[in-house]
UniProtKB/Swiss-Prot annotation:
It comes from the Eukaryota. One of its GO terms (cellular component) is chloroplast. Coiled coil: none annotated. The disulfide bond which can form in the large chain dimeric partners within the hexadecamer appears to be associated with oxidative stress and protein turnover. The modification N-acetylproline is found at residue 3. Its main location: plastid. Binds 1 Mg(2+) ion per subunit. GO terms for biological process: photorespiration; reductive pentose-phosphate cycle. This is Ribulose bisphosphate carboxylase large chain. The active site is at 175 (proton acceptor), 294 (proton acceptor). GO terms for molecular function: magnesium ion binding; monooxygenase activity; ribulose-bisphosphate carboxylase activity. Keywords: Acetylation, Calvin cycle, Carbon dioxide fixation, Chloroplast, Disulfide bond, Lyase, Magnesium, Metal-binding, Methylation, Monooxygenase, Oxidoreductase, Photorespiration, Photosynthesis, Plastid. The gene is rbcL.
Length: 477
């Protein structure tokens, strides 16, 4: 008889409550290549043993409930249950543990990030036996990876579409983010693209408000980028935010963008949801559109060290759901992002194979097989003085995005774009000549500013702007 249909009436049913660890803590378990593996940071309530806490996480995120039920006898729990197979104490933290849980692949619908998260994090985070819980990392088996389309195009295809090689791409978020009319918004887009940027961007909360309806914005931005393309001879793009209140409205906006002939659209993947994001990613691949992803709302989920979901997990989920770019923090700007942690999930976004490396917060080796890579986007409080560090940290396969660092230039948007393009080209040239960007960065920018008055003006404006705050989420010592 099949284990799925085998009944265990002969064993008998004993009602009542038993400890989770009797069923779900299995330190002898040998993980399988097809298991989804999870690393949880667990903070139990006082008096709850770590083994019971880890087993409770495995149970409540798979087949378990708070009491024994007679229908357990109608299936094979051994086949379907999650298992806490290892627990380790977090050094330097009181009553914190890393609980490793293995989930059999049969628990998850193919090609559905929505279902994966609903199972693994959907209910267990409110469990009373835990003071706090954080999902630190996931190992996605190749058998499951292959059920996802992933990014619509990936890094190499994007470079071929844009005909841009050998340097990071350069972008700008249009400011003020809210309040401009569609025509004035399009004018700002044109000036930035004409000045030398590759992309401009809708801010995450620009959808279709009374001061600027989406269709008007799309039309004026398309006019701006085509005019800038004609003048510069370079392919340009503007991230047209298709995020909407319904999937149907989102798709209507994406279809209109394709009809306009623009190269890229945008989605807020956490507020919009994984189902909507995957739907849009499939449309973008089928219709030749690049897809820029904003991570609005991520810090609500990932910023606290002891509770929530680490961004490296959200980044992996985005690569599965689909996106060609995603915001990843800057390390040097105004937003949260410790260097080693950021570089860890940047590699998880871009590379095909990533080895376990706890020094960068990577708990599991991850093989993405044929899933395309995602370009990390550095954005938030950055300006020309940051250019050497950004070029050194993120390398060529990245998007460096300056909003206020372009539009805040004292001479206007186009000179602001010129300043950033000159700074970028100077840093890339210096790097290619073997110069040390980390040590000589300021000197490289000063040298370039001697023959670029736009860059010299930008250097003067932002020479004293720093964001000296320690990161909240740091690696365990």
């Amino acid at each position: 008889m099949s284990p799925q249909t085998e009944t265990k009436a002969s064993v008998g049913f004993k009602a009542g409550v038993k400890e989770y660890k009797l069923t779900y803590y299995t330190p002898e378990y040998q993980t399988k290549d097809t298991d989804i593996l999870a690393a949880f940071r667990v903070t139990p309530q006082p008096g709850v043993p770590p083994e019971e806490a880890g087993a409770a996480v495995a149970a409540e995120s798979s087949t378990g409930t708070w009491t024994t039920v007679w229908t357990d006898g109608l299936t094979s729990l051994d086949r379907y249950k999650g298992r806490c197979y290892r627990i380790e104490r977090v050094v330097g933290e009181k009553d914190q543990y890393i609980a490793y849980v293995a989930y059999p692949l049969d628990l998850f619908e193919e090609g559905s990030v929505t279902n994966m998260f609903t199972s693994i994090v959907g209910n267990v985070f409110g469990f009373k036996a835990l003071r706090a819980l954080r999902l630190e990392d996931l190992r996605i088996p190749t058998a499951y990876v292959k059920t996802f389309q992933g990014p619509p195009h990936g890094i190499q295809v994007e470079r071929d579409k844009l005909n841009k090689y050998g340097r990071p791409l350069l972008g700008c978020t249009i400011k003020p983010k809210l309040g401009l009319s569609a025509k004035n918004y399009g004018r700002a887009v044109y000036e930035c693209l004409r000045g030398g940027l590759d992309f401009t961007k809708d801010d995450e909360n620009v959808n279709s408000q009374p001061f600027m309806r989406w269709r008007d914005r799309f039309l004026f931005c398309a006019e701006a980028l085509f005019k800038a393309q004609t003048e510069t001879g370079e392919i340009k793009g503007h991230y047209l935010n298709a995020t909407a209140g319904t999937c149907e409205e989102m798709m209507k906006r994406a279809v209109f963008a394709r009809e306009l002939g623009v190269p890229i659209v945008m989605h807020d993947y956490l507020t919009g949801g994984f189902t909507a994001n995957t739907t849009l990613a499939h449309y973008c691949r089928d219709n030749g559109l690049l897809l820029h992803i904003h991570r609005a709302m991520h810090a609500v989920i990932d910023r606290q060290k002891n509770h929530g979901i680490h961004f490296r997990v959200l980044a992996k989920a985005l690569r599965m759901s689909g996106g060609d770019h995603i915001h990843s923090g800057t390390v040097v700007g105004k937003l949260e992002g410790e260097r080693d942690i950021t570089l860890g999930f940047v590699d998880l976004l871009r590379d095909d194979f990533i080895e376990q490396d706890r020094s960068r917060g990577i708990y599991f080796t991850q093989d993405w097989v044929s899933l395309p890579g995602v370009l990390p986007v550095a954005s938030g409080g950055i300006h020309v003085w940051h250019m050497p560090a950004l070029t050194e940290i993120f390398g060529d396969d990245s998007v460096l995005q300056f909003g206020g660092g372009t539009l805040g230039h004292p001479w206007g948007n186009a000179p602001g774009a010129v300043a950033n393009r000159v700074a970028l080209e100077a840093c890339v040239k210096a790097r290619n000549e073997g110069r040390d960007l980390a040590r000589e960065g300021n000197e490289i920018i000063r040298e370039a500013s001697k023959w670029s008055p736009e860059l010299a003006a930008a250097c003067e404006v932002w020479k004293e702007i720093v964001f000296n705050f320690a990161a909240v989420d740091v690696l365990d010592k």
